[in-house]
């Protein structure tokens, strides 16, 4: 699909959906103090920008701001925004960040645990590693950030929520933790990716979500988890290009980060009297609530070399009809099928793929 054929229209539709979400939830989140970890770039930055537009007081917390100085300046020039340096594995840094937020805004209403270490940053972006090929150190590093770091952040920022008997925590996890629900299909169609120990950390955070939600329900705090699905996060472009060099299309055309905004606004407005202890798959939630299916949020303004990758994949993928509108498969199973079939076509067989690596 070329930009001239669908990019402009898709972008206009996406903007319309974003505006609708802002209009629907602005009254609920305006004035609320929302902390977003990993807020300097990618999904986190997108959420911060959207939440600011909704009238929230937004704290973007991140370990590094080296390539995001423009956003930091934007936040610091906005009376409703704040940028903080915060390593979620460092107790002192977390304490200092919490104190700075309280000094500035007086409280915390919402915590979005978006920061995490992904496989693509712990390991080379291509090449296969089985679970038994990983080391204890790999697991310690990944769990240190994704599980213990998340828990450390919750311990600090839930304090003002419990004190005011109202708040919301949103944990970002991964749809890959539900691979068993697809009969192992997730791994079967992505044997060239490294899923462990990353998926194990996200499974741990999912379990944490369910138990913590019940434990703090009496304190007025909602705790939920969201699975974004295939999204153009900050690491995505480099990974897709690395796979393309080996003749593999990396999964499917990603969604823009803004597709997380509608559900994030919804959850930011919750407390324990509303939705809590739940796990949401973002593309399905969007569709169920009138915010379009996955295809409506796919990114059609990728760099030219990446457009070539995904146009090639889409040319080999059958479309289907939903509500009378032709789309590419949008759900998890459809995405896996599309990626698997396209890569089989490119590689001829998994055997030849293995021998190439």
Curated annotation (Swiss-Prot):
Enzyme Commission number, as recorded: 1.1.1.256
SUPFAM superfamilies, per the entry: NAD(P)-binding Rossmann-fold domains
Family annotation (CDD domains): SDR_c (cd05233)
InterPro entries per record: NAD(P)-bd_dom_sf, SDR_fam
Catalysed reactions, semicolon-separated: 9H-fluoren-9-ol + NADP(+) = 9H-fluoren-9-one + NADPH + H(+); 9H-fluoren-9-ol + NAD(+) = 9H-fluoren-9-one + NADH + H(+)
GO BP: any one term: fluorene catabolic process
Keywords: NAD, Oxidoreductase, Plasmid
Superkingdom to which the source organism belongs: Bacteria
Active-site residues, record numbering mapped to chain: 198 (proton acceptor)
Annotated pathway: Aromatic compound metabolism
GO molecular function: fluoren-9-ol dehydrogenase activity; NAD binding
Residues binding NADP(+), per UniProt: 36-67, 87, 202
Group of enzyme by EC: oxidoreductase
A Pfam entry, by short name: adh_short
Record-stated family: Belongs to the short-chain dehydrogenases/reductases (SDR) family.
Function field: Catalyzes the dehydrogenation of both 9-fluorenol and 1,1a-dihydroxy-1-hydro-9-fluorenone to produce 9-fluorenone and 2'-carboxy-2,3- dihydroxybiphenyl, respectively.
Protein name (record): Fluoren-9-ol dehydrogenase
Lineage: Bacteria, Bacillati, Actinomycetota, Actinomycetes, Micrococcales
